[in-house]
């Protein structure tokens, strides 16, 4: 079957790449840079809380995700935070990338704005956030939040840290589309969003075989997606990785 042969190809390529190269790529991630700017400005505790809140409301954006995070990083690196909850709600109202469902975003942020994440135990943080916001731990913005909190930890402590294998990949549209583009699923990206657990299962298998945990694979897909979908390899993703996600016709930018 095509999916099986493509899965083998993806595993072999990413196994050769390895976790150390992925960690290097993470330092180039606009999300990492934005989080790092905020952590450097406000310290680990306040910076990680702001990053956590932004991750929790990072859905249905009116623009590219990279630009949303760049705006967040610039906004809070220039702001003197006096009242974290109030200041974050003001940010939601101000951001040009959060125009859809403003009140729903504010409601979700209010649920978590007093919570201080445990950066030493992100598994515990995931369980607690799941309870606080009333969502399953596999839900995309929750697991994405753990990735962002790891960025806050790495920036604050000046270290790399590999995340656990039992936290699944967040399945947003970019991940869904690249999974389809790689030939790993035979249903379209829109359906993949609904069947996100099936997509997570595939990337869990890739993670086990390559030694790259799912949340680190997410960074790789996110950065590669910019090249695949928009023809902009801004972060130096290896060409052989980009090629994995151009297996299907229609998975190259219009200029190619």
UniProtKB/Swiss-Prot annotation:
The active site is at residues 140, 172. Residues 125-184 are annotated as: Helix-hairpin-helix. GO terms for molecular function: class I DNA-(apurinic or apyrimidinic site) endonuclease activity; oxidized base lesion DNA N-glycosylase activity. 8-oxoguanine binds at residues 31, 58, 69, 144, 170, 218, 222. Its EC number is 3.2.2.-, 4.2.99.18. Belongs to the archaeal N-glycosylase/DNA lyase (AGOG) family. DNA repair enzyme that is part of the base excision repair (BER) pathway; protects from oxidative damage by removing the major product of DNA oxidation, 8-oxoguanine (GO), from single- and double-stranded DNA substrates. Contains two alpha-helical subdomains, with the 8-oxoguanine binding site located in a cleft at their interface. Contains a helix-hairpin-helix (HhH) structural motif and a Gly/Pro-rich sequence followed by a conserved Asp (HhH-GPD motif). Keywords: DNA damage, DNA excision, DNA repair, Hydrolase, Lyase. It comes from Pyrobaculum aerophilum (strain ATCC 51768 / DSM 7523 / JCM 9630 / CIP 104966 / NBRC 100827 / IM2). One of its GO terms (biological process) is base-excision repair. This is N-glycosylase/DNA lyase. The keyword Lyase applies. Highly thermostable. No decrease in activity was observed after heating 15 minutes at 80 degrees Celsius. SUPFAM superfamilies: DNA-glycosylase. It catalyses: 2'-deoxyribonucleotide-(2'-deoxyribose 5'-phosphate)-2'-deoxyribonucleotide-DNA = a 3'-end 2'-deoxyribonucleotide-(2,3-dehydro-2,3-deoxyribose 5'-phosphate)-DNA + a 5'-end 5'-phospho-2'-deoxyribonucleoside-DNA + H(+). It holds the Pfam family AGOG.
């Amino acid at each position: 079957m095509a999916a099986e042969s493509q899965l083998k190809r993806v595993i072999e390529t990413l196994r050769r790449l390895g976790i150390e190269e992925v960690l290097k790529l993470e330092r180039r991630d606009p999300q990492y840079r934005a989080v790092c700017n905020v952590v450097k400005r406000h310290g680990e505790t306040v910076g990680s809380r702001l990053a956590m809140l932004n991750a929790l409301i990072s859905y249905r954006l009116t623009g590219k995700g990279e630009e949303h995070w760049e705006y967040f990083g610039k906004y809070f690196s220039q702001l003197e935070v006096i009242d974290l909850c109030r200041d974050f709600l003001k940010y939601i109202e101000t951001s040009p990338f959060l125009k859809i469902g403003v009140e729903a975003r504010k409601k979700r942020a209010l649920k978590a704005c007093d919570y201080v994440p445990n950066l030493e135990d992100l598994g515990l943080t995931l369980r607690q956030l799941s309870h606080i916001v009333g969502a399953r731990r596999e839900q995309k913005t929750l697991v994405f939040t753990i990735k962002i909190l790891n960025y806050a930890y790495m920036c604050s402590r000046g270290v790399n840290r590999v995340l656990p294998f039992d936290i699944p990949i967040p399945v947003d549209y970019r991940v869904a589309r690249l999974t389809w583009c790689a030939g790993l699923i035979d249903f379209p990206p829109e359906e993949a969003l609904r069947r996100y657990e099936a997509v997570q299962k595939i990337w869990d298998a890739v993670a086990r075989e390559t030694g790259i945990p799912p949340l680190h694979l997410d960074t790789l897909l996110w950065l590669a997606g910019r090249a695949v979908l928009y023809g902009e390899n801004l972060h130096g993703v290896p060409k052989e990785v980009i090629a994995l996600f151009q297996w299907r016709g229609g998975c190259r930018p219009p200029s190619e």
